[in-house]
């Protein structure tokens, strides 16, 4: 910028993104069955999913969605080679992200048969992505939730507040990784009774930011 003094340099700090291998280790250590990736637009959800697949589920069937901005959203079943429109742009809808109107027939033609085959196989299933359009097809939503009981799921989940997406991420067997918050809040736990003297006495009365650890 023009108002920068001569000799000053602008330093841009990169956004921290754990490697796919690190996320995979955390997921496996959790003991959960499903790995759900969420985050804002452009946060790298699909890129991360593709990086995880070779180690996690290289041959899993995939149900993909792709948007043509201002026109439609298409769902594609990679195993069957089938595709259908599941959302169409509607200029009458309020401005914002959700200007696609759900097309239930598209879910019925491609989405539901794909989920049924995935459930029957009882292996890994890959879904990219699940979002607000699914709210227009109750059968598809229920099929995804039912599939969690018989399959292992690797999925990209759009970061929106809908009953379906909340139920999906709240599943007790789901490990949810949020790319907008890659590092959990840090805390400090002091394991001390206060009675031992190996590291000095009155440990719980030690000062931290002007206050004792234990009041």
Feature-to-residue mapping (PLM):
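Conserved lysine of the Walker
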Residues: 45
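N-terminal phosphate/diphosphate-binding loop that engages ATP/GTP or pyrophosphate donors
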Residues: 54-98
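Hydrophobic anchor at the beta1->P-loop junction of P-loop NTPases
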Residues: 37
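The conserved Walker
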Residues: 41
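Hydrophobic positions on the alpha1 helix immediately C-terminal to the Walker A/P-loop
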Residues: 48, 52
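N-terminal glycine-rich phosphate-binding loop and ensuing alpha1 helix
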Residues: 187-215
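N-terminal pre-Walker A segment at the start of P-loop NTPase domains
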Residues: 12-23
């Amino acid at each position: 910028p023009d108002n920068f003094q001569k000799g000053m340099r602008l330093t841009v700090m990169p956004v921290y993104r754990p490697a796919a291998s690190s996320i995979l280790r955390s997921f496996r250590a959790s003991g959960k069955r499903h790995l759900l990736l969420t985050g804002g637009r452009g946060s790298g959800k699909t890129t991360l999913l593709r990086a995880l697949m070779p180690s996690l589920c290289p041959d899993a069937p995939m149900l993909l969605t792709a948007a043509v901005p201002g026109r439609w959203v298409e769902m594609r079943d990679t195993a069957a080679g089938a595709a259908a429109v599941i959302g169409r742009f509607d200029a009458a809808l309020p401005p914002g992200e959700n200007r696609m109107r759900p097309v239930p027939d598209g879910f019925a033609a491609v989405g539901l048969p794909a989920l049924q085959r995935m459930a029957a196989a009882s292996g890994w299933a890959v879904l990219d992505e699940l979002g607000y359009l699914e709210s227009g097809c109750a059968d598809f939503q229920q099929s995804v939730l039912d599939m969690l009981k018989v399959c292992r799921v690797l999925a990209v989940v759009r970061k929106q507040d809908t009953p379906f997406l909340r139920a999906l991420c709240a599943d007790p067997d789901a490990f949810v990784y949020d790319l907008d918050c890659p590092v959990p809040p840090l805390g400090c736990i002091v394991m001390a009774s206060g009675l031992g003297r190996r590291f000095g006495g009155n440990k719980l009365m030690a000062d931290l930011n002007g206050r004792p650890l234990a009041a």
